[in-house]
Amino acid sequence: MSSTIRPIAIGIFRCDDRILVGHGHDVLKGERFCRPPGGAIEFGERAAEALRREIREEVRDEIAEPHLLAVLESTFALEGVPMHELVFVLEARFLDTHFYQLPQVAVYEPGWDGHLTWELLDWFRGGPNAFIP
């Protein structure tokens, strides 16, 4: 168990009334969750730079106009491991507009076999679909 706070940058990519998210599953809790794309902020890196790097690595595209929406503190457990994150939430857009036409966006991340999907904002309201920042 790590006793450090992990700073991350996540990107809100909008397409009409949908946002792009990855889906996860906590086997121990039996719960599914969603989270926007992004990842760890490296030492000396700004949040917008981290989001650019993560999208370049994971989605193979460049982003434009990343701007900070909020900074959140999140504590939770994943697979029984306590987590503590400072989450920099940025809104951005893809330079390659074809991503907005796809039902799924491939992710190139070692150790993670999945994709991102466009989900309606209403999908997260009042239901079992947990949104983790």
Which role fits each region the language model picked out?
Residues 16-18, 25, 92-98:
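Short loop segments at secondary-structure junctions
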Residues 18-57:
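Conserved Nudix-box catalytic region and its N-terminal flanking loop in Nudix hydrolases
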Residues 29-33, 99-133:
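Nudix hydrolase/Nudix homology domain
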Residues 62-71:
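A short coil-to-beta-strand element that immediately follows conserved catalytic motifs
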Residues 6, 14, 36, 63, ...:
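Short connector loops at helix/strand junctions that flank enzyme active sites
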Residues 74-104:
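Active-site-adjacent beta-strand/loop module that shapes the phosphate/pyrophosphate-binding cleft
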